[in-house]
Amino acid sequence: DTSSLIVEDAPDHVRPYVIRHYSHARAVTVDTQLYRFYVTGPSSGYAFTLMGTNAPHSDALGVLPHIHQKHYENFYCNKGSFQLWAQSGNETQQTRVLSSGDYGSVPRNVTHTFQIQDPDTEMTGVIVPGGFEDLFYYLGTNATDTTHTPYIPSSSDSSSTTGPDSSTISTLQSFDVYAELSFTPRTDTVNGTAPANTVWHTGANALASTAGDPYFIANGWGPKYLNSQYGYQIVAPFVTATQAQDTNYTLSTISMSTTPSTVTVPTWSFPGACAFQVQEGRVVVQIGDYAATELGSGDVAFIPGGVEFKYYSEAYFSKVLFVSSGSDGLDQNLVNGGEEWSSVSFPADW
């Protein structure tokens, strides 16, 4: 029965589920920003949190600069654009303007902040381990909209910093937020990037070779692998075991073709929990004994560790953002069974 698989809010215990884009998802507002929590600590066994942030343009920072000592934070731009700043220790401060499909990696103890640029912006945050949503429950106001609007329109002044003020943010250490109020975001961005010697939307981006360093991958400009075992799937890793270290997870996008009639859709099962959010196309997922369910843009499927699942693309081209607990999940299996690939599109023939 599909109806029992689909939920309006992430469950308070670990079970398979699908949650639609812009579901209530225990939404809260923090000033003009609206946060939804599609996967939470309790729903994932504290493996990871997957949250959506929708917000309008702002002339000010979305949050004051801070670090996390225990949580590895990932920023993915679904649509619109936002600027992300990150600095590790005494290293050079980095900043990029992220647009659709771009990714920013903020490991533990990296000072960071962001600013929403476009009126129709959505960020997906993947935070490891799970449970970081408790901060937003504490800071935010429960959203009570009945239309599932991406964010609640406001005529408020967009020039003041969103989120907790300097005195409040300094009291949030129990939520793993450590204010870095002396951090000054650099303002010398040219063509979406600073410092000047950095590559952004003009050439290849690599994942960090040194664990703990922040890094950025522009849409389509990172490493890619083509798996041809079950139709075509292109895995673009964002976080591997090298970067995750003891946080023990992987993060990728997976772009997929339809499944040829000669191929049987495989059944998968992994020790760690995993989830994916559809970014483009239509993806059918069948989890455990639940009926097959079609997911559209923004929809999220969560699969607990040890539960069998199948998935395939109903559209000619679909793309998902995929997170897995552990270092040997679906994305890594597809990479291991594939080959390095230079294109974002799959071959023209089977």
Curated annotation (Swiss-Prot):
GO molecular function terms noted in the UniProt entry: metal ion binding; quercetin 2,3-dioxygenase activity
Catalytic activity: quercetin + O2 = 2-(3,4-dihydroxybenzoyloxy)-4,6-dihydroxybenzoate + CO
Alphabetically ordered keywords of this record: Copper, Dioxygenase, Glycoprotein, Metal-binding, Oxidoreductase, Repeat
Domain of life the protein comes from: Eukaryota
Compositionally biased tracts (Low complexity): 152-167
Residues reported in the UniProt entry to bind Cu cation: 66, 68, 73, 112
Top enzyme category: oxidoreductase
Activity regulation info: Inhibited by diethyldithiocarbamate and kojic acid.
Region annotation Cupin 2: where it falls in the sequence: 206-350
Residues of this chain annotated as glycosylated in UniProt: 90, 109, 142, 191, 248
Names of the cofactor(s): Cu cation
Entry's EC annotation: 1.13.11.24
Cofactor detail note: Binds 1 copper ion per subunit.
Region annotated Cupin 1, chain positions: 1-145
Post-translational modification (record): The N-linked glycan at Asn-191 consists of Man(5)-GlcNAc(2).
Region described as Disordered: spans on this chain: 148-167
Pathway assignment: Flavonoid metabolism; quercetin degradation
Stated name of the protein: Quercetin 2,3-dioxygenase
Native organism: Aspergillus japonicus
